[in-house]
């Protein structure tokens, strides 16, 4: 359990960074799709 408590925040931080990066890149190439969904 102690290993989970030290690994979970690191994994969450990496996951949110990757997700934010994907959203930023997607918004740069397809800016209209995020603000005007079909």
From Swiss-Prot:
SUPFAM superfamilies: Subunit IX of photosystem I reaction centre, PsaJ (SSF81544). Signal peptide: none annotated. The chain crosses the membrane at residues 4-24. InterPro entries: PSI_PsaJ, PSI_PsaJ_sf. GO terms for cellular component: photosystem I; plasma membrane-derived thylakoid membrane. One of its GO terms (biological process) is photosynthesis. It holds the Pfam family PSI_PsaJ. It is found in: Cellular thylakoid membrane. Keywords: Membrane, Photosynthesis, Photosystem I, Thylakoid, Transmembrane, Transmembrane helix. This is Photosystem I reaction center subunit IX. It comes from Synechococcus sp. (strain RCC307). The gene is psaJ.
């Amino acid at each position: 359990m102690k290993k989970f408590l030290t690994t979970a925040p690191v994994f969450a931080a990496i996951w949110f960074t990757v997700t934010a990066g994907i959203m930023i890149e997607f918004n740069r190439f397809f800016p209209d799709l995020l603000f005007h969904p079909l």
